[in-house]
Amino acid sequence: MRGQWGRRPQETIDRANELLDNFAAQLEKRGIRVDRPTPTDFSLPVTTPDFHTDSQFGCMPPRDVLLTVGSEILEATMSYRCRWFEYLSYRPLMQKYWEEDPNFRHEAAPKPRLTNEDYHPRLPV
């Protein structure tokens, strides 16, 4: 998958879903609730008033976006343009949790604009 751009091959999607289904089943056997984000086509381009990128490649690792602490979910912001709308896959779950639990809280960090002036693609990481 290294260096690939655009939609992932269907066989890799199917294999990943099989692995996730098996992992979810193991967790559920232990009494752990498993919720899945809304499927999203991350091969689509992203356009805002400040930038355009041809793909959302790299989206979906929830460990990068969300941190659960008790009944609160903290949402980080993504500094890569291709991941700017990644949070949208999780918003239906946030709504569900809010409806289920009166103590549920969702805190989100401010999103950067990622204009050409403040986004430096060649900055060493």
Walk through the language-model features, giving the residues of each.
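The feature marks the mature, well-folded catalytic cores of soluble enzymes
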Residues: 1-125
